[in-house]
Design a protein with these regions (language model features):
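Short, contiguous alpha-helical
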Residues: 2, 35-81, 107-110, 124-156
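A glycine-rich, hydrophobic loop/mini-helix early in the fold
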Residues: 26, 30-31, 40-41
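Acidic/histidine-rich alpha-helical segments that form the ligand environment
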Residues: 16-27, 85-122
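Extreme N-terminal tail/first-helix region
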Residues: 1-23
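Alpha-helix N-cap/loop-to-helix boundary motif
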Residues: 9, 16, 42-46, 53-57, ...
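A generic "alpha-helical surface" signal
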Residues: 11, 15-18, 48, 52, ...
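Residue-level recognition of alpha-helical structural elements
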Residues: 6, 13, 36, 43, ...
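A short small-residue
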Residues: 1-5, 82-90
Length: 156
């Protein structure tokens, strides 16, 4: 499947996210529970831990999208990615549950992205003390980040 970056507005980005989820979910469900425990890179996270990270990413970005629609500017804290994965004991979580939650959350985020008004896309957003970017960048970067990790686990 070709999930390459496409030009367009938020409705197109929302459609792209739905297409990614619909294409990848069956591939993730085909990964066995035992296979999901194996690190994808030497010394790195397992597929299960990557899924936990992607759920955290969805949760954090959901708040960013909504709060930026309600404000003239957004200052949002960063988060400890490795710490989140560790304290939630993602490695012990049920694989099918993680995949199902990830897919459902991203389908909902596609709905939210489709609601982003054009006049809010330039809302300045600062995350975790980084440089200021636009809400459009945050939304597009979310999908690119998602794809990076799906490629990392071999399903995109």
């Amino acid at each position: 499947m070709d999930f390459s970056r496409q030009e367009g507005g938020m409705k197109e980005l929302a459609g792209r996210l739905r297409e990614i989820v619909d294409g990848v979910e069956p591939r993730l469900m085909a990964v066995s529970a035992s296979e999901s425990l194996v690190p994808v890179l030497r010394g790195g996270w397992s597929r299960r831990q990557v899924m936990g990270h992607l759920i955290d990413s969805a949760s954090n970005n959901h708040q960013r999208f909504v709060r930026a629609m309600l404000a003239d500017a957004l200052a949002f804290p960063g988060y400890d990615q490795a710490g989140n994965v560790r304290v939630q004991a993602v490695q012990e979580a049920d694989w099918a549950l993680l995949v199902s939650l990830w897919a459902s959350y991203n389908r909902y985020l596609a709905h939210v992205l489709g609601q982003l008004p054009e006049d809010k896309l330039d809302t300045p957003c600062r995350i975790g003390g980084g440089e200021t970017v636009t809400l459009r960048f945050v939304a597009e970067d979310y999908v690119e980040h998602l794809l990076h990790h799906l490629e990392q686990v071999g399903v995109a």
